[in-house]
């Protein structure tokens, strides 16, 4: 009898799995930053909640290929020009490999992945079958960032008659260069439904003569309570201002954070992938599980962000924050701040005003706007899946 019941349960589970739509997501998740990891995690969680079976295409472009990074460091180690090169290579190898293991553990635990692919040719040859092919979020359509148009992120490998949609894709800039307009249009014409993350992205797609909708970044599809339940706790006792920046030059961001921390009588913590020490920072947060980063956001007194996801998480988790303008690609941050009516939270270091920065954000209006945008974003997914 027990064996019979187990067989019935297995059969029911199998039927349920087979009834789920298999969605292949092509997104930028291997960028070695927490925002990229959290956005694909959130999208997968929501698609599962909607009754689908999301699978992430484990595509690793050349520019972020671990083998290439390790080979470069080994070359520096065995063909050094100075003692500093040797020390730097050893440190770099330790950090790179630990960082890879950290993200790999997270992805294996939380997200369904295909095998690894390293080129469009490899993906096209694989003939991966799915009910829906989806371009996911982050700067998948940014030709500057991707060193050209990356056909994998435009689903060129998907069968011609297959269903293709995008969710919260980003061009990361205000307009396309002339050289990429025709090819981008041809690739997007194959899509059944297009949604982008920024208002400027909608303008780009509309200018190509195609319909488009603005939706929220996937991290917003999980609300504050959702993230609280999923976060991994840290055990810091000190109060702190949190820096979340992906900018290479962090000195101006640190200076701003230091002003705020001194006023609030707190320490300064900074999320930094390589444990590199910075003057003015009391603690580096690095090589931890992406879901622990959420807890650092939840428990901070204030966030100084200089990235899209640093800004997005601050808003979604209802934190007091400012977003320091980056050297480029600020359109991403401007767009989300406009959606929640917080344009004044974007500041340049040269125009930083401590008193304005510390003006408290009233999250009642922000939450209302966010809930409306979240509902519209969910409607897009439900309608097109």
Task: Give names to the regions the model predicted.
Residues 8-385:
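Active-site anion-handling motifs in enzyme catalytic cores
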